[in-house]
Amino acid sequence: MRVRTLICTFGFNEKKVLVAMRSIPYSRLVLVAGKDVLDGAEYRLMVALEEKSGGTVETVIVDPFDFADCYDGVDRAIRSHLTGGDVTLNISGGTKILADAAILAAFQNGVEAYHCEESMVKLPVMRGVRFEDAFSVEDVKVMENFVEGDSTKSIGARMPDLSDASLRKSLKHLERLGVIVPALEKGEARYHSTPGHRDIAALAGRCMR
Protein backbone atom coordinates (compact mmCIF):
# COMPACT_ATOMS: atom_id res chain seq x y z
CA MET A 1 0.00 0.00 0.00
CA ARG A 2 1.43 3.35 -1.05
CA VAL A 3 1.87 5.92 1.70
CA ARG A 4 0.31 9.32 1.01
CA THR A 5 2.43 12.11 2.47
CA LEU A 6 1.16 15.66 2.94
CA ILE A 7 3.95 18.24 3.21
CA CYS A 8 2.89 21.65 4.51
CA THR A 9 4.84 24.87 4.84
CA PHE A 10 4.08 26.18 8.30
CA GLY A 11 4.33 29.47 10.18
CA PHE A 12 2.37 30.74 13.15
CA ASN A 13 -1.11 30.13 11.73
CA GLU A 14 -2.36 26.59 12.17
CA LYS A 15 -5.70 27.31 10.45
CA LYS A 16 -4.20 27.13 6.95
CA VAL A 17 -2.68 23.72 7.60
CA LEU A 18 -5.93 22.49 9.16
CA VAL A 19 -7.75 23.33 5.91
CA ALA A 20 -5.20 21.23 4.00
CA MET A 21 -5.50 18.36 6.49
CA ARG A 22 -9.28 18.32 6.07
CA SER A 23 -9.20 18.68 2.28
CA ILE A 24 -6.30 16.47 1.17
CA PRO A 25 -6.20 12.72 1.92
CA TYR A 26 -2.95 11.71 3.64
CA SER A 27 -1.45 9.13 5.98
CA ARG A 28 1.72 11.00 6.96
CA LEU A 29 2.11 14.70 7.83
CA VAL A 30 5.33 16.67 7.31
CA LEU A 31 5.67 20.31 8.42
CA VAL A 32 8.40 22.55 7.00
CA ALA A 33 9.03 25.50 9.29
CA GLY A 34 11.52 27.83 10.94
CA LYS A 35 13.06 26.87 14.28
CA ASP A 36 11.16 29.59 16.18
CA VAL A 37 7.85 28.01 15.24
CA LEU A 38 8.60 24.95 17.38
CA ASP A 39 8.09 26.97 20.57
CA GLY A 40 4.67 28.26 19.50
CA ALA A 41 1.29 27.07 20.71
CA GLU A 42 0.21 26.63 17.08
CA TYR A 43 2.88 24.00 16.44
CA ARG A 44 2.11 22.15 19.67
CA LEU A 45 -1.56 22.11 18.68
CA MET A 46 -0.73 20.56 15.30
CA VAL A 47 1.33 17.83 16.94
CA ALA A 48 -1.38 17.13 19.52
CA LEU A 49 -4.13 16.89 16.90
CA GLU A 50 -2.13 14.53 14.74
CA GLU A 51 -1.19 12.31 17.68
CA LYS A 52 -4.83 12.23 18.79
CA SER A 53 -5.77 10.80 15.38
CA GLY A 54 -3.05 8.14 15.68
CA GLY A 55 -0.42 9.82 13.52
CA THR A 56 2.86 11.60 14.06
CA VAL A 57 4.34 14.83 12.72
CA GLU A 58 7.67 14.90 10.93
CA THR A 59 9.23 18.37 11.08
CA VAL A 60 11.81 19.77 8.66
CA ILE A 61 13.60 22.85 10.03
CA VAL A 62 14.68 25.56 7.57
CA ASP A 63 15.62 29.23 7.63
CA PRO A 64 12.30 30.69 6.38
CA PHE A 65 14.08 33.80 5.04
CA ASP A 66 16.73 31.90 3.05
CA PHE A 67 15.38 30.79 -0.33
CA ALA A 68 18.07 28.20 -1.01
CA ASP A 69 17.76 26.63 2.44
CA CYS A 70 13.96 26.49 2.11
CA TYR A 71 14.22 24.90 -1.31
CA ASP A 72 16.73 22.30 -0.13
CA GLY A 73 14.58 21.39 2.89
CA VAL A 74 11.38 20.95 0.89
CA ASP A 75 13.18 19.15 -1.92
CA ARG A 76 14.73 16.64 0.50
CA ALA A 77 11.37 16.04 2.15
CA ILE A 78 9.66 15.41 -1.19
CA ARG A 79 12.36 13.07 -2.45
CA SER A 80 12.53 11.07 0.76
CA HIS A 81 8.80 10.32 0.67
CA LEU A 82 8.34 9.80 -3.08
CA THR A 83 9.99 6.37 -2.94
CA GLY A 84 7.12 3.93 -2.67
CA GLY A 85 4.59 6.65 -1.97
CA ASP A 86 2.73 9.73 -3.15
CA VAL A 87 3.44 13.30 -2.07
CA THR A 88 1.16 16.34 -2.03
CA LEU A 89 2.34 19.82 -1.07
CA ASN A 90 0.45 22.65 0.61
CA ILE A 91 2.23 26.03 0.48
CA SER A 92 -0.17 28.28 2.38
CA GLY A 93 1.84 28.53 5.63
CA GLY A 94 5.03 30.35 6.58
CA THR A 95 6.88 33.14 4.79
CA LYS A 96 6.49 34.02 1.13
CA ILE A 97 10.11 32.96 0.60
CA LEU A 98 9.32 29.52 2.00
CA ALA A 99 6.17 29.25 -0.12
CA ASP A 100 8.00 30.29 -3.30
CA ALA A 101 10.78 27.78 -2.64
CA ALA A 102 8.24 25.05 -1.93
CA ILE A 103 6.33 25.55 -5.18
CA LEU A 104 9.62 25.45 -7.09
CA ALA A 105 10.53 22.18 -5.35
CA ALA A 106 7.11 20.80 -6.29
CA PHE A 107 7.72 21.89 -9.89
CA GLN A 108 11.13 20.19 -9.92
CA ASN A 109 9.74 16.92 -8.59
CA GLY A 110 6.43 16.93 -10.45
CA VAL A 111 4.22 16.61 -7.37
CA GLU A 112 0.77 18.11 -6.84
CA ALA A 113 0.72 21.42 -4.98
CA TYR A 114 -2.11 23.36 -3.36
CA HIS A 115 -2.72 26.65 -1.60
CA CYS A 116 -5.22 26.14 1.20
CA GLU A 117 -6.85 28.97 3.14
CA GLU A 118 -10.63 29.30 3.20
CA SER A 119 -10.69 26.94 0.22
CA MET A 120 -8.26 24.67 -1.60
CA VAL A 121 -6.69 25.91 -4.85
CA LYS A 122 -4.62 23.56 -7.00
CA LEU A 123 -1.44 25.13 -8.37
CA PRO A 124 -0.12 24.41 -11.87
CA VAL A 125 2.77 21.93 -11.83
CA MET A 126 4.11 20.62 -15.13
CA ARG A 127 5.27 17.02 -14.99
CA GLY A 128 8.41 16.20 -16.97
CA VAL A 129 9.61 19.83 -17.09
CA ARG A 130 12.40 20.95 -14.78
CA PHE A 131 13.60 24.34 -13.61
CA GLU A 132 17.02 24.06 -15.22
CA ASP A 133 15.45 23.46 -18.64
CA ALA A 134 14.75 27.21 -18.77
CA PHE A 135 18.46 28.11 -18.61
CA SER A 136 21.48 27.31 -20.75
CA VAL A 137 24.95 26.76 -19.30
CA GLU A 138 25.85 30.24 -20.59
CA ASP A 139 22.82 31.76 -18.84
CA VAL A 140 23.97 30.32 -15.51
CA LYS A 141 27.51 31.62 -16.00
CA VAL A 142 26.22 35.10 -16.76
CA MET A 143 23.99 35.06 -13.66
CA GLU A 144 26.85 33.89 -11.46
CA ASN A 145 29.20 36.60 -12.78
CA PHE A 146 26.66 39.41 -12.90
CA VAL A 147 27.31 42.60 -10.91
CA GLU A 148 24.56 45.16 -10.31
CA GLY A 149 24.65 47.92 -12.93
CA ASP A 150 26.75 45.90 -15.38
CA SER A 151 26.99 46.84 -19.03
CA THR A 152 27.45 44.23 -21.74
CA LYS A 153 31.08 45.31 -21.96
CA SER A 154 31.79 44.97 -18.23
CA ILE A 155 30.20 41.52 -18.02
CA GLY A 156 32.11 40.42 -21.10
CA ALA A 157 35.40 41.59 -19.59
CA ARG A 158 34.91 39.16 -16.70
CA MET A 159 33.94 36.33 -19.04
CA PRO A 160 36.55 36.28 -21.81
CA ASP A 161 35.73 32.66 -22.68
CA LEU A 162 32.19 33.63 -23.73
CA SER A 163 31.74 35.05 -27.22
CA ASP A 164 30.05 38.42 -27.65
CA ALA A 165 27.18 36.78 -29.55
CA SER A 166 26.62 34.18 -26.81
CA LEU A 167 26.75 36.86 -24.11
CA ARG A 168 24.18 39.04 -25.85
CA LYS A 169 21.95 36.02 -26.44
CA SER A 170 22.06 35.08 -22.74
CA LEU A 171 21.39 38.65 -21.61
CA LYS A 172 18.38 38.86 -23.91
CA HIS A 173 17.10 35.48 -22.66
CA LEU A 174 17.53 36.43 -18.99
CA GLU A 175 15.74 39.70 -19.71
CA ARG A 176 12.78 37.82 -21.24
CA LEU A 177 12.64 35.56 -18.18
CA GLY A 178 12.57 38.60 -15.90
CA VAL A 179 15.82 37.77 -14.10
CA ILE A 180 17.47 41.05 -15.14
CA VAL A 181 16.13 44.34 -16.49
CA PRO A 182 17.96 46.84 -18.72
CA ALA A 183 18.04 50.59 -18.13
CA LEU A 184 19.57 53.32 -20.28
CA GLU A 185 22.08 55.25 -18.17
CA LYS A 186 24.21 58.02 -19.69
CA GLY A 187 23.59 56.66 -23.16
CA GLU A 188 24.60 53.10 -22.27
CA ALA A 189 22.42 50.08 -21.49
CA ARG A 190 23.08 48.75 -18.00
CA TYR A 191 21.47 45.76 -16.35
CA HIS A 192 19.92 45.45 -12.93
CA SER A 193 18.84 42.30 -11.13
CA THR A 194 15.31 41.54 -10.04
CA PRO A 195 14.53 40.22 -6.53
CA GLY A 196 15.70 36.63 -6.11
CA HIS A 197 18.33 36.86 -8.87
CA ARG A 198 21.09 35.36 -6.71
CA ASP A 199 18.80 32.59 -5.48
CA ILE A 200 17.82 31.74 -9.05
CA ALA A 201 21.45 31.70 -10.16
CA ALA A 202 22.53 29.47 -7.29
CA LEU A 203 19.63 27.08 -7.76
CA ALA A 204 20.04 26.84 -11.54
CA GLY A 205 23.74 26.16 -11.15
CA ARG A 206 23.16 23.49 -8.50
CA CYS A 207 20.50 21.76 -10.60
CA MET A 208 22.89 21.49 -13.53
CA ARG A 209 25.72 19.91 -11.56
Where is each model-derived feature located?
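Long, low-complexity, Lys/Arg-enriched
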Residues: 1-86, 100-209
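Elongated alpha-helical scaffolds
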Residues: 90-101
